[in-house]
Amino acid sequence: MADDLFDFIETEGNFSQLLAAAAAAAEEEGIASGPDGGSQGSRRRGSSGEDLLFGPGGLFSDDAAEAEAAVLAAAAGATRPPRPPSAQQQRHARRGSGEIVVLDDEDEEEDEPGSPAAGSPGRALHQGSEHGHLVLGPRSRAGSGPRPPTPAALAAAEAGAPGGPGRSSPSAASPASSSSGSSGSSGSPGPSAAPRRWSPARGDPVGEPGPAARPRTPAPPAQPAAVAAAPARRGPASPASPAAGPVSAPGGGGAPSGGGDRGRHHHQHREPLLDEPAAARRLDPRPLGARSPVSSNPNSSSSSTTTVAVEPVARGPEKDEDGLGLAGDGGAPLQRQPRRRRAGEGALRRGRGFSSSSSGGSDSDLSPARSPSAPRAPAAAAAAARRSASSSSSSSSSSSSSSSSEGEEDEGVRPGAPLARAGPPPSPPAPAAAPRPSASSASATSSSAAASPAPAPEPARPPRRKRRSTNNHLSLMADGPPPTDGPLLTPLGEPWPGSDPPADGRVRYGGAGDSREGLWDEDDVRQAAARYRAAAGPVPVFIPEMGDSRKQHEALVRLIYSGAAGEAMSWLQNPRMQAPDQRFNQFCQRRVHAPHGHGSFITGSVTPPLPHIGDAMAAQDPLWALPHAVSAVAMSRRYDRTQKTFILQSLRRAYADMAYPGRAADPRAGEATVEALCARVRAAFAAAQPGRVPRELADACVLACRGVLERLLPCPLRLPAPARAPAALGPACLEEVTAALLALRDAIPGAGPAERQQAADSVALVARTVAPLVRYSVDGARAREAAWTYAAALFAPANVAGARLAEAAARPGPAEPAPGLPPLWPEQPGLVVPAPAPAAAGAPSGLPGSGPSSPASTKSGSSTKSSSGTKSGLSGSSGYASSPAAGPDPAPERRKKKRRAPGARRPGDGEEDEGLSGSALRGDGHGHRDDEEDRGPRRKRRSLGLGPAPDPAPALVSSSSSSSSSEDDRLRRPLGPMPEHPAPDGGFRRVPAGETHTPRPSAAALAAYCPPEVARALVDQEVFPELWRPALTFDPAALAHIAARRGAAGAPLRRRAAWMRQIADPEDVRVVVLYDPLPHEELCAEPAEGAPRPAWDPRRGGLSALLAAFAHRLCTPDSHAWAGNWTGRPDIGRLNAQGVLLLSARDLGFAGAVEYLCSRLGAARRRLIVLDTIEDWPADGPAVGDYHVYVRARLDPAAQCAVRWPECRELRAAVLDSSSIVGPACFARVEASFARLHPGAEPLRLCRQDNVRYTVSTRAGPRTPVPLPPRAYRERVLPTVDGCKDMARQRSALGLGDPDFDAGAAFGHRAANRWGLGAPLRPVFVSCGRRGLAELRGPEGLPAELRAFCAAALLEPDAEAAPLVLAPGALAAAGAPPAVRWDFAPFETSVRAAAGGAVETHRPSGARGPGEDGEDSAAVEIVGFRGGDGRPRGPLGPIKVEAISDDEEAEDAGNPYLLLR
């Protein structure tokens, strides 16, 4: 019968006729039940057939047997007792109250034998609810449409006459069942009423529990709850016509009806009271005015009685919003919504629909487990407990009956939404996961609840607003935020569906639970996985085959919280890819995305850098969803950049506690960010005021930079331009910068890649700006760290470690630093120098009374490091016997190569010398050995005995047998410890007091001392000019070197002392230029035949670059200015005549000479100008006091555009100029200082072509000084062709077919005859500034007008011309590009120059050659390659005669040299 009725309902949808038939049968039989369960003798008037459907024993009641009996009684008039419930009926009775439960195929089970539903085709209709809910099973297997009704069912339903197989009296129902009486509306639908279909209330879920409701314990199926039948209505109620009349119940009064326009489409609710039990807080699904108070017993410990009414609704043709297609006259019949079940979804799919669950009265609404902000873990635990308890059954119990309906789009009832009804005061709270009560206890509970009085009627509330229903159970949320602790679970506290690991050989792809085949064996994937493992940040393309996505997720989160606001979003949308990443991205598009549908196909990630969202769901980590949210916003086209930035900032703030969980309790939470600290550094430099910077303050800045770099490693560093000039920095600026760096060091942990890059850039900016203040060396700052002193002592050899540690402990503590700065030592300790002690036997030092602990025995502290990495010893120990004129050795056995003293090496200084007997002192002190020593030891040394003997060094002076022997020993060992009162004419370093421009020497260098008589004996030689000999006494290292070569002033020593002959009198020195030559570059040495030539270095300049700057010319590998092309020493006489002294770091007495000049001129109240071009400052270099003028510049061959951009032809003659590079701007500073210090002297001319002359090989001879003046050129060339009548030979000898200029110098006959052979073309200098030179990346960075000017300009040689410096913004003042004009030929305007193997023809602007009408005069035309004439043969023009003689009045008749053209 039930099957027939279901078929009838599905096919015809005439639910109202069924109700009418049931009402007619009820009128005949008088079916009604009282509160006590007995049958009513008389049926109340106005009740409808819904009592037979939803009342006790009705079709949709709890018991299937009673339901079927009631329907049969209504249709056929037969009466029979109900059958006991089957297992399936009991299972469906636990499905939850008042629900429409859509079952999947796997929910169906075999019914027990004898069950009415067993084997019945109508088992799709289950009566398994506590309070009469509708349970729909799977559709027919044959098709998706409903099954046709049977004729018997149709007839029985329409006529309402007897026709069923037996009738059962309603009085035979269980006596425990109860029904609350209700009074119907004014009219009940009869058989003639219009057909209506039953549907739940549109828009509002029925029976939804409140946010604080606890899981209810279902009542046993044998004790069905009372159901109040709602009267049927045809249409919506009007304000004048209420939806229903008052409803009465035993023990309670009628509730007033709440009218309104919405009528039956809304439910009336009120807010729950805190003193009401949870059993009474039920959603009343009845229409307005059709409710009755809930009958509950406040004395009962658990109550499960709930009133539920499902009303029939007449809807229009539109589809119901819940997507089930229930309403509407023309709508589709009731069907289950097809859906795919996921893993872990068992409890979720059973709680769908309209539910009104019950729970024990002991459940407290104030329990934190069900509070709006509490997690749902107790619900999940209760569900798991009930599933384990009912393992014999295939479906779990309704532990999730408290889940929200499908109409809720957020968790829980929204703020302002009506809540469940309130009841009596709450009972004591119960445990969160209480066991399910038995059937007997539930029955007793139901009975006691039914007999309890109902509360007072509730007032009417405004109708509840509609909400759009969804079909996704995951949208069931609760009020308030989700749990903030623990894993992120579903709203029901279960794992996310589809988060299980994919099957073997597959990876996540697509929707939840979907996967694809893995591609681990592809080469592209393996390479991408290797890059992913090695990457420090996020990779631009990620797929699951590359490895664990945790690293990528965390890197993306760091990226979002780093850098500017829009950088992360831009990178996520369009990640910057290198070539391998681009190839891998194409591979993924071809092999991963293309086989899986179109562009809108669900992939689980938005952009290539994002891993699949299933990894975040499986990890249950909400922080991993942040990159997906940011990427989704970035890909949206509905926001502009500012709006996206706002959303990103909102997400960053919302996720901040998860991304940085310890920041709230971190005391540094309020400190500035990395970006703000970097801006603070830049602002400090921008606001710098000039002032004298103490050296310890600069060292503190260096230490702060080192601290930041220590936190950043590894980090990509870029070399920026200095922010300010050294003279513009003041102490306040450095204090602010150092404090910002210290704060930046502490802010580095936790910073993202972009922030780390900003910090690295800031450190590089500070380093390049402060580097001139520390003389481009960190040794002084490192020596100020106290920890290094102790570390050097601890790591020293055992025989000196104790003494060094004691000395370190005895040193004074660090000085009080400035506020916010690290502590600094009062002086640079360098290597700890223990106190002098009596030397022991066998000590290798040659100093009297010195041992391993003597200051002079520490060669690292008393050596001078040159640019090539070699060092000169400070003491003349142990090497004097190797000298050819050393005389007899009192200890022959000491000629054997001695071992170095333990601990004599300075930590971190690299390879050391072997004393003065090593290569550094056997040669020129720079690693160049003497020629005579390269042949090995002398024969005389071999004849001496080599037997072992104790070292008599400590007693050489005191125990010598003769005075001559004692004198020789003193000359061989000139240095000793510094006495308390050194003699004024002794040999020692004289460092001025106060601040210095350059680093101060180490303590060991300052402790070396040579007695005056020994010093005079050593410097009294012809190789040293007399006026310069005092300069050597300022350098103990030079005295030690002279002592090692005493009596043998060979070529190396003479070469190193040749600088003394540049200017005869030190009083005439005005400017000292310090430079560091490249290997094999010599200023005062003749290049030997077969000697190694210097190697060209485009990144480092040496002597060649310096002289080219002074000579106002270019220096390229094929030019005369390059030292590799020299055949003799260059001539710098014009510079020396102006008082300019060039001093190399390799020269003998380099440090002493500078300090001597500073001391001598400073004592005369004269200031010395020091131009420093040394990049690698040598150890123990000269200390220049701040009294003198100090100018710092570097030599950079790449400043020449021909070297910087060799492919750019138009800028071959251009040179980039800046005050930080040796050139016109730097020379202008020196010249201005000179004019200020010497106003009456001749002004300096540091950038002129006659300052330097080179000796090179030309056609005039192998050693030709260039530029060779025109007269000297003719004197050398013309005699070779005198009397020669062979014109071809004359042409070849004079170079008539050669270009005018080659490699920028005059080469052809007519150019050499006019300007001199080798006269260079002048370059064009382009002023860029300090910052502009560093930021200039290519020739495109220069204005096009400037490039055109440089291409057309041709500056003819001029020995007295000043440099032409152009500013990119001041080209208008430069006028037309200069050009060469031949004054002897009216039509000869072009200049032929060779460069790069090609010959180019340059014509001045506006000039035209013969027959060149309309040709671009500024064009550069390549007419041929070198080797031939190369000139195009035009029409024969008039014969031109060139006067070779200087005599302008000479007659051409006697001149045999006529040039034909």
Swiss-Prot record:
Keyword Metal-binding: no
Segments of skewed composition (Acidic residues): 102-113
Post-translational modification, as annotated: A long stretch of serine residues may be a major site of phosphorylation.
Biased composition (Low complexity): 75-90, 167-197, 224-249, 292-308, 353-405, 435-453, 838-888, 944-965
Biased amino acid composition, Gly residues: 250-260
One annotated GO molecular function: DNA binding
Stretch list, region Disordered: 25-60, 75-518, 811-1002, 1395-1461
Primary location: host cell
Basic residues composition-biased segments: 894-903
Pro residues composition bias: residue spans: 423-434, 814-826
GO-annotated biological processes: DNA-templated viral transcription; positive regulation of DNA-templated transcription
Compositional bias per record (Basic and acidic residues), positions renumbered to this chain: 270-285
Cellular component terms per the entry's GO annotation: host cell nucleus
Compartment list: Host nucleus
Record's keyword annotation contains Transcription: yes
Pfam assignment, any one: Herpes_ICP4_C
Keywords per UniProt: DNA-binding, Early protein, Host nucleus, Phosphoprotein, Transcription, Transcription regulation
Function text: This IE protein is a multifunctional protein capable of migrating to the nucleus, binding to DNA, trans-activating other viral genes, and autoregulating its own synthesis.
Family per similarity comment: Belongs to the herpesviridae ICP4 family.
Protein's recorded name: Major viral transcription factor ICP4 homolog
Biological source species: Suid herpesvirus 1 (strain Indiana-Funkhauser / Becker) (SuHV-1)
Gene name tied to this protein: IE
